[in-house]
Amino acid sequence: MGANSSSPAGLTPSSLPDDAIEVGRILDAWGVKGWVKILPHSTDPEALFSAKSWFLQAPEAKFRPGFNAFSGTVLLSVDEAKTHSDTVVAKFSGQDDRNAAEALRGARIFLPRSSFPVASKDEYYWVDLIGLNVVNREGVPLGQVRDLMTTGPHSVLCVEYTAQQEDGTAVTAERMIPFVSAYIDTVDIAGKCITVDWQPDY
């Protein structure tokens, strides 16, 4: 899905697997021994912890550190990854100083979907929720999950729907529904539907 064109020493040029899923982004260097700080795209970063290697894709221009940035896609072996406050920190094999870590700033992290561990009961990967239709208990359609976001202790569904303006013009709007048991009744991945205790005028 895209090969690397150049990379600093120690980074292995690669390409993304067909089932690659973006799971996080490198925020910055952490410490002076090559560690990086990561913002995971999930409140449960178990997929990151279970993988022995990660695919990194070069950051978009606005996220580039301005120096030593690689291009394309590289594959790095993970020596260690662990939680740190509300982020994840990780150390890659062969990346042993702060300069090496800073060269990765802004990089997008991908993993093959097939490598994800099986989610526990009532736990879901964000990628499996995006695109699901959302209805309330009365069967009223509320829209489709476009994205998710994290707000402290829980995730929030970003549900896109079509609204009518006063002049009758249809516009795309968005409603935010907390992904917590108080509002989420059922999640049917196979049926592509989430049932919620929510009203259209909330």
Swiss-Prot record:
Note the subunit structure: Binds ribosomal protein uS19.
- A GO term from the CC aspect: cytoplasm
Q: Which InterPro entries match?
A: PRC_barrel-like_sf, PRC_RimM, RimM, RimM_N, RimM_N_sf, Transl_B-barrel_sf
Q: GO: which molecular function terms?
A: ribosome binding
Could you name the domain of life of the organism this protein comes from? Answer: Bacteria
| Record Pfam families | PRC_RimM, RimM
| Keyword terms | Chaperone, Cytoplasm, Ribosome biogenesis, rRNA processing
* The keyword Cytoplasm is annotated on this UniProt entry: yes
Q: What is known of its domains?
A: The PRC barrel domain binds ribosomal protein uS19.
Q: Which organism is it from?
A: Polaromonas sp. (strain JS666 / ATCC BAA-500)
In what residue span(s) does the PRC barrel domain sit?
Answer: 121-202
Chief location of this protein within or outside the cell: cytoplasm
Query: Cytoplasm: present as a keyword of the record?
Result: yes
What HAMAP family does the annotation carry?
Answer: Ribosome_mat_RimM (MF_00014)
Which compartments does it reside in? Cytoplasm
Protein name according to UniProt: Ribosome maturation factor RimM
Q: Which GO terms describe its biological process?
A: ribosomal small subunit biogenesis; rRNA processing
Q: What does this protein do, in the record's words?
A: An accessory protein needed during the final step in the assembly of 30S ribosomal subunit, possibly for assembly of the head region. Essential for efficient processing of 16S rRNA. May be needed both before and after RbfA during the maturation of 16S rRNA. It has affinity for free ribosomal 30S subunits but not for 70S ribosomes.
**Which family does the similarity line name?**
Belongs to the RimM family.
